[in-house]
From Swiss-Prot:
Pathway: Carbohydrate degradation; L-arabinose degradation via L-ribulose; D-xylulose 5-phosphate from L-arabinose (bacterial route): step 1/3. This is L-arabinose isomerase. One of its GO terms (molecular function) is manganese ion binding. NCBIfam families: PRK02929.1. It comes from Shewanella sp. (strain MR-7). Its cofactor is Mn(2+).
Amino acid sequence: MKAFKQKQVWFITGSQDLYGPKVLEQVAKNSEQIVHGFNESSAISIEVVYKPTVKSPREIHAVCQAANSDENCVGVILWMHTFSPAKMWIAGLNELSKPFMHLHTQFNAELPWSEINMNYMNTHQSAHGCREFGFIGTRMRKERKVVVGHWQSSDVQAQIDDWCRAAAGWHESQNLRIARFGDNMRQVAVTEGDKVAAQIQFGYEVHAYSLGELNEAIAAIAEGDVTAQLDRYASEYQVGNELFGDEYQLDRLRKEAKIELGLTQFLTQGGFGAFTNCFENLTGMTGLPGLATQRLMANGFGYGGEGDWKTAAMVRIMKVMGQGRAGGTSFMEDYTYNFGATDQVLGAHMLEVCPSIAAAKPRLEVHRHTIGVRCDVPRLLFTGKAGPAINVSTIDLGNRFRIILNELDTVTPPQDLPNLPVASALWEPRPNLAVAAAAWIHAGGAHHSAYSQAITTDQIVDFAEMAGAELVIIDADTKIREFKNELRQNSVYYGLARGL
């Protein structure tokens, strides 16, 4: 079973009528076998759909139009089995609005040395057919992924899957709706941004709603549904006897369950995939949602605190991209440092860290929330599982959006955190905290990020290229002088590219 149900990537092979019916039959047969191999492979998480070989400008244009209008198609893989004169592709590529990958492969891995003849050479021409196609992509300035190697190679299939996941994320971005309850935290700069520009570039819509509308949805939840929700909490988390045995704590938990159910209903009925709220805008609420927000994220919704709609969007997009993979994705904040032999960052937030990143079964507890509405709020407590991760931040620079990515190594805390009443993750940024933090600050990265152990750097690279967005990467090879020069060069490139 593929991780992405209903979503598809189309496999389109290019050729021409020059070769005659026998060669074209072989081209079609080989293409079908490749598609079958991809669909049988556990390495590729999305269904690949075979499309008949295209041999003329009219056929190419028609299949590109069909891909555009098919809601289930998130992108296309293009392969030139033989030589397919690239002028035939101009109208189709001009029409194509879905992302495309150029797969530079051939059907047979090895040459049949003792049998090879000109019939074989004319049938298996990817080596120069794909170069012809590559030229027209470059000439038309088309952004695309190029994957090179034999189609059965595990490395090639991993690259294909990375791109397919990015294409699924881009498809989600094009259809995503984000609900904002309240506004940004007052006087905060980085969570602001141009929502119209974001919709033009990324596709997602951001809509504001009053707390009154949300409170109506919460008030409409039946008490029987609240009781059933408490039963779910008891079965899914570590819950101390004192919580259900204490009348006051139980009341706070019932209120939180009601918030979760009301929020879920509001978002689902409105077709929203992500939401934001702010601790400064809680009129009529019993508190800042804690457990409710954590569970909504665990169920796939994106979230951004303090009105941070850009991070909410990225959390949702990355959750879609990571479907079926180990690890999780969460809203996150760089909170405090541990300077020592190896400098570390303790990431957390006031309440809202997703349990999909938890190292062990979370504990459900009620603690005092001291910012905004000061009250006792149920929340899940845990530490993040150890392993490689990334932090991704999207910022608005005025004339463009920039995505900043830092590769991390999440580690197990050396000691317990018995007095910390929020979920957290401890990580060591690559190459180290001194370089990573300086680079992040030079790039303008936010204090919020989308943290993930399910998504790879390559997938974010593919996504950023689909979006036409600037991406800067902080990893083990980062050096500050080179990084600052990259930022300067990017400023020139993206400034000129808008007018070219």
